[in-house]
């Protein structure tokens, strides 16, 4: 309310569609429910456990995990879906015989190299590595690891580490003006305090 001067909030609907049970699944159930409460107070309608199966000029079609379908009439849509891997991943898999997961990410060794190809590193959201989400901190950490390994090889020394280990520095998401959620280790915050931390 008050954010978009040209939109009458009494005539508009904001509908969040998500395939998960609650918003922001990486933040856990507790913060997901807090997010749900905050969005509901803002008048956001939530369609959880639902996937978009069709979008056209007049609306959006959803399919719920339960199997039921729903049509939402809409002239304005905002798509903010997750990331999908680059087509380069599938091409790399086909060219080298490497395993590629459903999302198009390439399975890598513990040192982030392609199985059978120690000269090829696959990094960031193109790599399929257990416990590493497709976010910037995963990409940065994997790039630093690979850079150190390559530099060590060129200098004829051992790398600082022989296996990549991801360190989750935490996640933050802003929900609305002066409202956010933060998860850093065991610390969880919501509301204004989380927004200030963000």
What are the residue ranges of the model-derived segments?
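Rossmann-like dinucleotide-binding cores of NAD(P)H-dependent redox enzymes
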Residues: 1-50
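Alpha-helix termini
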Residues: 1-8, 66-67, 153, 157
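Hydrophobic/aromatic beta-strand patches that form the interior of the parallel beta-sheet core
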Residues: 15-17, 47, 78, 121-123, ...
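Cofactor-binding loop segments of dinucleotide-utilizing enzymes, especially the Rossmann-like FAD-
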Residues: 19, 125, 177
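A conserved short coil-to-beta-strand element within the FAD-binding core of flavoproteins
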Residues: 48-59
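A structured beta-alpha segment of the ubiquitous adenosine-cofactor-binding alpha/beta core
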Residues: 52, 63-70
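FAD-site-proximal beta/loop scaffold in flavoenzymes
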Residues: 59, 72-144, 148-152
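C-terminal, flexible cofactor-proximal segment of oxidoreductases
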Residues: 142-198
């Amino acid at each position: 309310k008050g954010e978009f001067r040209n939109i009458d909030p009494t005539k508009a609907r904001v509908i969040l569609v998500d395939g998960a049970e609650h918003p922001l699944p990486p933040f856990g159930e507790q913060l997901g429910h807090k997010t749900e409460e905050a969005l509901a107070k803002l008048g956001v309608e939530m369609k959880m456990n639902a996937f978009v199966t069709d979008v056209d000029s007049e609306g959006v079609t959803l399919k719920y995990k339960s199997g039921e379908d729903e049509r939402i009439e809409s002239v304005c849509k905002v798509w903010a879906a997750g990331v999908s891997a680059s087509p380069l991943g599938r091409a790399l898999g086909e060219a080298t015989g490497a395993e590629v997961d459903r999302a198009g990410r390439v399975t890598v060794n513990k040192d982030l190299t392609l199985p059978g190809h120690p000269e090829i590193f696959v990094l960031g959201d193109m790599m399929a590595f257990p416990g590493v989400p497709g976010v910037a901190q995963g990409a940065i950490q994997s790039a630093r690891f690979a850079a150190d390994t390559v530099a060590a090889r060129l200098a004829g020394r051992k790398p600082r580490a022989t296996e990549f280990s991801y360190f989750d520095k935490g996640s933050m998401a802003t929900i609305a003006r002066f409202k956010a959620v933060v998860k850093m280790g065991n610390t969880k915050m919501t509301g204004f305090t989380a927004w200030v931390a963000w």
